[in-house]
Amino acid sequence: MSSEKSSFPEKPPSFEKPSHSNTADHTRSGVHYFFAGWRLISLPGIRRFVILPLLMNIVLMGGAFWWLFTQLNDWIPQIMSHIPSWLQWLSYLIWPLAVLSILLVFSYLFSTIANFIAAPFNGLLAEQLEAKLTGQTLPDSGILSIAKDVPRIMKREVQKLAYYLPRAIVLLLLYFIPGIGQTVAPVLWFLFSAWMLAIQYCDYPFDNHKVGFSTMRQALRRHKVANMQFGALVSLFTLVPFLNLVIMPVAVCGATQLWVDRYRNLSATLPKKSP
């Protein structure tokens, strides 16, 4: 047989399990990466890239949650009125679930809007932090460098919305089913939010390396438990007053550390998106 290489295309990456040399990084939980983000935002040379996402998050999330809390007194009685009579005896349990449901739905909505607006700066933060963590030369961070990436970044954000909206609508419809809407739906929404927030923040370093959106999701599924842990903590801290004002840059930094440990060495083998 000929010794020449086959002309057939190579198989797509299968995201095989990591080698033993990287076992330590691959056994770290999503909890580890979430709390690593709090430390990373204060690294010398990184703080200045945290400021803009932080300020935007304070303005958007602060204003949004202030508005939400002014509406809760009107919304909760309306939700409780939809509870069927045979579940009235559980109203003392369903009431906090109803509050949690509203907070979960709107916190993710507010977070999505804030991330859409701040996406170019979050991408820059991820890029600069990755260079810092890997000892590479810091990339250009000028206005022109940011501006040329804006169309690509905004296109990626639209892809995320296209993935999110159909699934979110189906879950939101569950809230209108008596009984299920006040019990099962909040749990499903929390799990969905955890997955979407993992996608949202882990995507910044993937997109910086021009890894396609579907390929990125496939890679995240290989470590779904850790990514769900990370997303769940981001979701929970988004509900906590004051802490939710700084959660955006923290999550970007934690997700970038996760990329460096688990996915960066695979990036050369991952199919790139078309320009």
Curated annotation (Swiss-Prot):
Q: Which GO terms describe its biological process?
A: cysteine biosynthetic process; sulfate assimilation
What is the membrane topology noted in the UniProt record heading this document?
Multi-pass membrane protein
Q: What keywords tag this UniProt record?
A: Amino-acid biosynthesis, Cell inner membrane, Cell membrane, Cysteine biosynthesis, Membrane, Sulfate transport, Transmembrane, Transmembrane helix, Transport
Positions of the region Disordered? Answer: 1-24
Q: Where is the composition biased (Basic and acidic residues)?
A: 13-24
- The record lists its disulfide bonds as none
Q: What's the domain of life for this entry?
A: Bacteria
Name one molecular function that GO assigns to this entry: high-affinity sulfate:proton symporter activity
The protein's matches in InterPro entries, at most eight in alphabetical order, are given as:
CysZ_sulfate_transptr (IPR050480), Sulfate_CysZ (IPR022985)
Q: Which residue ranges traverse the bilayer?
A: 49-69, 93-113, 169-189, 232-252
GO terms for cellular component: plasma membrane
* Compartmental location: Cell inner membrane
What function does the entry list? High affinity, high specificity proton-dependent sulfate transporter, which mediates sulfate uptake. Provides the sulfur source for the cysteine synthesis pathway.
**Family indicated by similarity:** Belongs to the CysZ family.
Q: What is this protein called?
A: Sulfate transporter CysZ
Q: Which organism is it from?
A: Pectobacterium atrosepticum (strain SCRI 1043 / ATCC BAA-672)
